[in-house]
Amino acid sequence: MAAETASGYIQHHLQNLTYGQLPDGSWGFAHSAAEAKAMGFWAFHLDTLGWSVALGLIFLFIFRMAAKKATSGQPGGLQNFVEVMVDFVNGSVKDSFHGRSPVIAPLALTIFVWVFLMNAVDLVPVDWIPQLAILISGDPHIPFRAVSTTDPNATLAMAFCVFALIIFYSIKVKGLGGFIGELTLHPFGSKNIFVQILLIPVNFLLEFVTLIAKPISLALRLFGNMYAGELVFILIAVMFGSGLLWLSGLGVVLQWAWAVFHILIITLQAFIFMMLTIVYLSMAHEDNH
């Protein structure tokens, strides 16, 4: 255990491996939340970046391998799994996306599998990966957070990429004038030109809040659920390491029970992120408000 107290243990497991400029002007790793905060905006969460990229490459490798081994005869287990995933996502896109775009289904598949893989790391016992990082680095105080979706920087980055696509397709389908009109002429309208002009600021405020709420809610929903799930695992680990025999036994039972339930959570959160992305992009392809 990297920290002697329960609170220190929890704080250590909820801190990212942060690299940035230290208060003395040198560059290095933060060993406390205070040091990470002092680094400011231009600090890098290397654990989030590393795991996100690694799991993305694993996703590409698995699906590429399945595509290369695809045969018209008897398919193997991996090919069956990939085909089920592709059919499931393709069906979800057909049911929810009402426009025409060849990139939506591949985007939805990428989001679902990538987010699921990042969420699935939460099923690894909470001490294994941080202890491995300590073993490799030789620093007993270095933090390491393996679940990328418990970092709001990761979920917000994905959500604002979706937001950029919403803006892009809104302008592409409706034109710049149509997009601006959508923000300023709805939900309140009037046949009187003077009244309509007066309503523009009100409409813009309401529509802007609705628009910007999409990526924020998309990111915070995923982050909040995964952060809470990770915190429960950490609290169970604290109970397990309390030294009391009956609490340790209860901790084992709770750990397995929560892990089984968490399989549903990680899958559901990946599905929700994918479905909301499809719905938002479908709305961006609609000509009418």
Curated annotation (Swiss-Prot):
Residue runs in coiled coils: none
Signal sequence segment: none
Protein name: ATP synthase subunit a
Cellular compartments annotated: Cell inner membrane
Membrane-topology descriptor: Multi-pass membrane protein
Major place of residence: membrane
Keyword Ubl conjugation: no
GO biological process, one term: proton motive force-driven plasma membrane ATP synthesis
Top-level taxonomic group: Bacteria
Organism from which the protein derives: Pseudomonas putida (strain GB-1)
Keywords: ATP synthesis, Cell inner membrane, Cell membrane, CF(0), Hydrogen ion transport, Ion transport, Membrane, Transmembrane, Transmembrane helix, Transport
Cross-referenced InterPro entries: ATP_syn_F0_a_bact/chloroplast, ATP_synth_F0_asu, ATP_synth_F0_asu_AS, F0_ATP_A_sf
Quaternary data: F-type ATPases have 2 components, CF(1) - the catalytic core - and CF(0) - the membrane proton channel. CF(1) has five subunits: alpha(3), beta(3), gamma(1), delta(1), epsilon(1). CF(0) has three main subunits: a(1), b(2) and c(9-12). The alpha and beta chains form an alternating ring which encloses part of the gamma chain. CF(1) is attached to CF(0) by a central stalk formed by the gamma and epsilon chains, while a peripheral stalk is formed by the delta and b chains.
MF-aspect GO terms: proton-transporting ATP synthase activity, rotational mechanism
Native organism taxonomy: Bacteria, Pseudomonadati, Pseudomonadota, Gammaproteobacteria, Pseudomonadales
Biological role: Key component of the proton channel; it plays a direct role in the translocation of protons across the membrane.
Similarity-based family: Belongs to the ATPase A chain family.
